[in-house]
Amino acid sequence: MKKDFNFLTLALGVVLAATSVHAQTGARATGATPATRAQTVAAANLLASLPASEAVMSVDVRRLLSDALPRAYNNNPAELARINAEIDKFKASTGLDARTIERLVVGVSYQQTATGKTLVETVALARGNFRAASFAPSKSRMQEQKYAGKTIQVFNVDTQVKLIGLFNMRVTDVAVAMLDANTVAVGKLERVRAAIDASAGRGRVSPEITALATRDANALVGMGGNIPASLTQNLDMGNISKSIASVRQFYSTLGTTANGFNMLTALRTENAGAAQSLSTMITGLKQLAPFALGQMPAARQRPLRTLVDNSKVGAEGNDVLITLELAQVDVAALIDAF
């Protein structure tokens, strides 16, 4: 059976669930080696090239493909073949091959409609070894236009594809523009235009936002951003809503260990009192988790129980802190269960 649930879905899903759940303390980049410092600089420089965004994410794609994904899927040939098929599908549609990307950053903006619905708009900047001439897909319709001296190719994809074949941000119309010899912008047309402006120094993302995503020099994935009031103001869960609405920012990292993976997310609230209240609420929900898990199929109960048991919750200043460490076999079991 084809699964839309994948390792990145797991990672990002736990982080998003942490908007009522996950974290760890500040920067863990102490004792950074020259190599990790170089990684931090590379991530920060590419993130700084994003257009204005409410939240950002940085991914070490080379490590993701060569190490993290094979480990997360326990080197399952069928699952790894499925991932490669998704990568090839996006390549066939746009000409962009994830295997040529070294690092990817994503900028997210929120747009509220007149009806109060919040729309999420994304743009990705990929840095790697590729050529503009390679963007010549055979299975999609393409239009070309000029903007601020750059060429934008807009592809109409016949079927929905994952962004670069890895991320569950499914797109049908994909705009692609080379920003320089080694950097390409991918996303909705309006956001790609904004990325072109940002590459020229206009309307860039706030340094405060990018700093949240680069707290850990060794992270496989780092992310951070603001939590707009529009995302939480309509929650109707009593005191729980009040606690969640106190969150102003978040940051999170996903890393690898000798035996598996670790994750952190910090939920930054408006004051220390709010952080303590939210921490207490999450701890209470964690204690109730076994009752909810008992209603699930047995195949899902065990990996989810391991996830809950291995998470730790606390408060430090204005931050709610939650850590999670999972062995490789537990990550593989969680993915397999979904």
Across the structure, where does each feature detected by a protein language model lie?
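Bacterial N-terminal signal peptides
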Residues: 9-19
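Structural boundary/hinge residues at secondary-structure and domain interfaces
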Residues: 24-166, 170, 213-243, 278-310, ...
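Short, exposed beta-strand/loop patches in secreted or surface proteins that constitute
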Residues: 142-146, 175-177, 254, 309-315
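A conserved glycine-rich beta-strand in the N-terminal activation segment of trypsin-fold
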Residues: 168-233
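Bacterial N-terminal signal peptides that target proteins for export
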Residues: 1-10
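One face of beta-strands
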Residues: 57, 122-126, 248-254, 259-267, ...
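Short, solvent-exposed coil/turn segments at beta-strand boundaries
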Residues: 52, 119-121, 149-150, 177-184, ...
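Small-residue helix/turn framework positions
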Residues: 229, 239, 251-273, 277-289
